[in-house]
């Protein structure tokens, strides 16, 4: 048997976004900027940051990590969520001149004695090397929650579902992946306060520029 390592013959790259991205300021860009400035996002994970979220990522580890997340997202939504009525990347959203691209959306109809209530739900899919113990009840995950609240603001809803693939579970041996799904109902005040933070940060940076 003759074996040759030929990894370099098949270089990784980042595919185009499934949803066309409009030029301008994006929610993800603002969130990454705030997280980097406040120390929530460690410098080694920050890559290139910009309000427009137009990044030139060249680090092989970052490219591989992003590809893992994209592969899981594509399989998970298309194979496992669509049968439940979840739409894959339906469209880009915009509010106050800031753009965003939710992973998926669904609509639930709840029938009550007084009539029916239509509930619009934002879905976000993550693949992470974080431990289930670290993530816990999500309260420590500022970037994820801020992303969900900003999408909720643009979609006019307070409801979200976060689907997380913990690639290494809780890191207890033997290492095994764990999937957890969190249903979240924000208050309108939480959604509004989050959006005010992002919008005000954008406005401040544009004045400084």
Describe each region flagged by the PLM.
Residues 135-141, 157-209:
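Metal-dependent nuclease catalytic regions and adjoining charged, substrate-binding loops involved
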Residues 74-82, 139-167:
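Metal-dependent nuclease catalytic cores in nucleic-acid-processing enzymes
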Residues 107, 153-155, 197:
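Short alpha-helical scaffold segments that flank and stabilize functional sites
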Residues 111, 147-150, 186-189:
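Glycine-rich loops and low-complexity Gly/Arg-rich segments
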Residues 126-129, 166-167:
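A short beta-strand motif that forms part of the nucleic acid-binding face
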Residues 1-122, 129, 135, 142:
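Metal-dependent nuclease catalytic cores that hydrolyze phosphodiester bonds in DNA/RNA
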């Amino acid at each position: 048997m003759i074996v040759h390592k030929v990894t370099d013959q098949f270089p990784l790259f980042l595919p185009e976004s499934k949803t066309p991205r409009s030029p301008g300021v994006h929610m993800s860009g603002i969130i990454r900027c705030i997280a980097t400035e406040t120390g929530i996002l460690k410098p080694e994970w920050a890559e290139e940051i910009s309000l427009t979220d137009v990044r030139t990522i060249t680090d092989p580890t970052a490219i591989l990590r992003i590809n893992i997340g994209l592969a899981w997202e594509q399989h998970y939504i298309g194979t496992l969520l669509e049968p439940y009525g979840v739409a894959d990347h339906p469209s880009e959203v915009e509010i106050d001149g800031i753009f965003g691209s939710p992973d998926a959306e669904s609509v639930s109809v709840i029938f009550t004695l007084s009539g029916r209530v239509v509930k619009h739900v934002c879905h976000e899919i993550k693949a992470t090397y974080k431990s289930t113990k670290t993530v816990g009840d999500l309260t420590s995950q500022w970037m994820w929650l801020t992303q969900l609240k900003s999408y909720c603001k643009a979609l006019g809803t307070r409801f979200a579902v976060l689907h997380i693939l913990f690639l290494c579970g809780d890191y207890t041996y033997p290492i095994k992946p764990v999937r957890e799904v969190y249903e979240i109902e924000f208050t309108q005040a939480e959604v509004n306060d989050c959006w005010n933070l992002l919008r005000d940060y954008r406005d401040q940076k544009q004045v400084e520029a």
